[in-house]
Amino acid sequence: MSFLQSERIIEVQDQQEMVGILGRNDELLRVIKEHYESVIVARGNVIVFSGEDNEVGQIETLFKELLFLYRQGMPLTTHDVRYSIGMIAEGRLESLHRMYADTIIVTNRGRQVKAKTLGQWDYVETIKRSNVTIGIGPAGTGKTYLAVALAVKALKNKEVERIVLTRPAVEAGEKLGFLPGDMQDKVDPYLRPLYDALYDMLGSETFQKYVARGTIEVAPLAYMRGRTLNDSFIILDEAQNTTPEQMKMFLTRFGFGSKMVITGDITQIDLPNGKNSGLKQAAYVLQKTPGVGIIRFGEADVVRHEIVAAIIRAYENYDSRRQKQREADNDNNAGK
């Protein structure tokens, strides 16, 4: 069976655009060539590709999309290229456009923050329309970073009066009372990922100014007890390490004009043996509650180095095999 062959050309404005869509040292071009059998050659300001007609059509669509994104000021990564290839192959170009069209915020250094997967886009849209959003998924899915970006955007747009970020201050069995230094010294290491995200969005000087005014508060979860948080964007990070009692306490801090986001990874629970995770319980108890949105991220939503996705996949397969083995052992014991 023979397929119709064709050749097409994409022309760019200059070498800067060529590097922008093919990557430094053709890093992005190599990713593209891995996915297609067609011959792809870049020379001067022209990219020529030839092969089976349907595949050539997909390649043309891909390059046009990459060129469009680059011209919108978006630095392209290998993840962007791989994800775009997959979406185009599935005929979901419109969804890809919609996802990349929305810039959440521009960081202090001028970088555009956007959703990078449909799962992330769904998460962002859920946060926008929900009073409380629970985001569950592995590292690298942007759960916390995107929530912080939306919080900063809401603050800048005067939709809220302050941002409150918190996480459990006891992880991996460490008790704050046994750590050296004053309370700030003790809690800073636990809150550092939240500081990092805020520094990225605002810059150190603006962040410190907001903290001094009380516009931004970063504190351990225990500091939330007995408060009602009105007109606030509230984020609870590492929520898998809350107990059910702590989670209920946190949820009931919600006040008028506020928005709440809870993030965590239920495969990384550091609670002592016998302690249930408040995040797992909340996701179950609140799944049908009006105003509450629940998003579960998967491997496809990991936007880090490819090795991170591979590691997550390996652990998920391992956990699945262990679960099946436990079920088989239980069945065998029941039959004795």
Residue positions per predicted region:
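Intrinsically disordered, low-complexity linkers and terminal tails enriched in Pro/Gly
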Residues: M1-F3, A89-T103, S320-K336
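Short glycine-/aliphatic-rich beta-strand segments at the starts of folded cytosolic domains
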Residues: S2-G20
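Short amphipathic alpha-helix segments
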Residues: E17-E34
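Hydrophobic side chains in well-ordered alpha-helices
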Residues: I21, L28, I59-L62, M247-F250
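Compact, well-ordered interaction domains used in eukaryotic information-processing assemblies
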Residues: R30, Y36-V39, N45
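Interdomain "pre-motor" coupling segment immediately N-terminal to P-loop NTPase/helicase cores
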Residues: V41-Y100
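Conserved helicase motor core of SF1/SF2 NTP-dependent helicases
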Residues: V46, V106-W121, T126-L236, Q240-K336
